[in-house]
Amino acid sequence: MTASTRNGSPSPSPAAPTAAEQESKSMTTTPANPPETKSQTNGKGSGTAQSSQKPASTSANAKDPLRPRRKKAKRACFACQRAHLTCGDERPCQRCIKRGLQDACHDGVRKKAKYLHDAPNEALLPGIRGNYYNQANTTRNIPNQRGNASNSNSNKVSRQSVSSANFYTPQAARSYNVYVQAKSQQSHVRPAVMQDASMNPSVFHAQSPSSTQNFDLSSNPQTQNLSSAMSQTASSVSGQNQDPFGAAFFDPSHPALFNFDIASMNFGNRYGALEFGMLGHMATGAGDTPPSDSATQRGSIGRSSGTFTAQNFGDSANNQSPFLFGDPVLNDWNPTGQGQANPRNIYNQNAVAGQMGEQNPHAFAIESAPMNFASPSSTESPQMTTTTPFDEANANFSSRTNLMHPTNTPQQSRISTPGLKHQGLHVGVKRRYRSPSSIYESVKEPYSYTSGFHSLTAFIQRRFSPQKTLQIAKALASIRPSFIATTKTLNQDDLIFMEKCFQRTLWEYEDFINACGTPTIVCRRTGEIAAVGKEFSILTGWKKEVLLGKEPNLNVNTGSSLSSASSVRGSSTFTPRNNNTHNSIDPHTGMPTVGGGGASGRTQPVFLAELLDDDSVIEFYEDFAKLAFGDSRGSVMTTCKLLKYKTKEDSAALFHGKEETQQGGVDGSSGTGTTTSGDVATTTATGTSTSNGANANTNGNNTNPNDPSTAASSSASSGCRARSNHLGKRGGRGALPAKRG
């Protein structure tokens, strides 16, 4: 552009256009490189206009800030990986297209990390944009989610979905988000009369086509528009969500199965990302344990059809429920359709409105998975109805609750385990509250440990052999001086205080024993049972009342052949243990008492030594001697053998049952030798052989298997006097060495 100056006044050339005209002309002709026009005028009004244009090669400059930055590819193709060149996410990549290798362009194989050497190659899938899942045949037209979107936008979305059919498109996963992404969805679905209400039906995009929701809204004409809009929305979503992933629907490695974005988890491969995603899915979706707080009540997700009546929506426009009817709130509806909705269990709009906006990220992406992808265990979890009043956020709605008429039908808990369905289990029954102050009021006298030790000593001498009794006595003698030294200065009040501390400790252990599923038993230092869990009773058959001395102890199983054999064949020689031991039955109360029902009249609990076999009892007292005064908070982990609770009738029924089922003895004798484990109870062909203690072996004295007239003489063991009358012979295995009495 040129300008001439004559007589101090500027006179532009008539043929040359002005600066504005030339700028507009250059913008229309070359829009890619618009000129920069600068005009300078002096004080006399004269000036020159200069224009400069950037060269075309400027955009190719590497240091140009306007140069488009290349995104780093998730994984390079095989050709670019070998050539150590930059690749792209598209397949085939641009470099392979230029070289004519588009048919052979595929993702390269990375070197496995050390912690992935044992992982299969199928688990190490390519990146989120790899072509592992080909959706070219399963891609469907994605419906327009914005009500005011133009046709060009919808065509652009459809072209984008078709062009990226070979990749895992985020559009397909977007439909599974419970949280809405645009405020225009609310205005598109809501009827005009409900603009002031807080119901957002757009969250029905998260419902799966397999979930059929029945809305009975015909009674209210104002909600008919809502029901029609919901049906249209559900039908459009059903066509969209029906088998959205084609053949990869049941593939556990597919990321959409757990509805989370692997690319946002910053993992180098899918193996680690899927592992953490599955753990999160199990922690949030599989349990579905309803918390106690009604403000955050989630409950279990119902998978079957639910019934929504018009009463829950209100009978007028001023009585609309301010709740969301999406996946988070359908959890508390009865899946069997037997109960109506409880509005106290549903989220309010004020509490969730801050999370539903499009400016916030999609939190809890794993928990908002579609209903058909959820764990089947959530369908069987018990439903829970709370009666907690509304929170402060629903204060404006509490004045209209009298018009809603919710029907709170009591719902029974459903148990998914087949073995527990036939048992009368009371789910959710709270433990009766008991104040610890009752312990200090009830304990008035100390516990008689002296009588307990005397009873323990008498029991050990009767049951065990002298050799085993000596081993137990040595263990107790090692702690006897220390025990006497610590208790000789205690007076009556100290002993009462010690018993209160013991009962207070049992009160604390009660919750622990009930909460823990491990068989647990607590005993005093005398070995008397003080507390027992129900799992221990189930395991051994010992009732809690029997162990605590509240019922008679009729056990005959002592871990040796003395218990069951002689008591069955010779019933006249059987004497209940409670009549000739430290326990005797009170004829008035039927309870076992100490000292044959003496003056004390104290009920006698079962000793721990009665529950164990001989070797386990010796090992217990040896460990007890080490921990009694050496380490007050020590513990020993060991193994032991427990004896099941068996009465005389149980042993007789067991013996007769085995005798009837087994036929054909040796040399024509009926019945064979049987060994029952509970513990060592041995019965022979036609007679019984009894022993007491591990070192006592009794049998016939060198009976000849070939001589049927040989009879076994009576034998006695070193631990007790056991009488054995052999009417036949012991056949099959020869004879054991006999100890004559």
Swiss-Prot record:
Annotated CDD domains: GAL4
Location of the protein in the cell: Nucleus
Chain positions covered by the region annotation Disordered: 1-70, 135-163, 202-239, 285-321, 401-421, 559-590, 655-741
First-listed, main subcellular location of the protein, grouped into a coarse class: nucleus
Composition skew (Polar residues), residue ranges: 25-61, 202-226, 291-321, 401-416, 573-586
An example molecular function term from Gene Ontology annotations: zinc ion binding
UniProtKB keywords: Activator, DNA-binding, Gluconeogenesis, Metal-binding, Nucleus, Transcription, Transcription regulation, Zinc
Residue ranges of the annotated DNA-binding region, renumbered to this chain: 77-105
SMART domains linked to this entry: GAL4 (SM00066)
Listed Low complexity bias regions: 227-238, 560-572, 672-718
Residue ranges with Basic residues bias: 723-732
One Gene Ontology CC term in the entry: nucleus
GO biological process: cellular response to starvation; gluconeogenesis
Domain of life: Eukaryota
Family: Belongs to the ERT1/acuK family.
Function per UniProt: Transcription factor which regulates nonfermentable carbon utilization. Activator of gluconeogenetic genes.
Official protein name in the record: Transcription activator of gluconeogenesis BDBG_05438
Lineage of producing organism: Eukaryota, Fungi, Dikarya, Ascomycota, Pezizomycotina
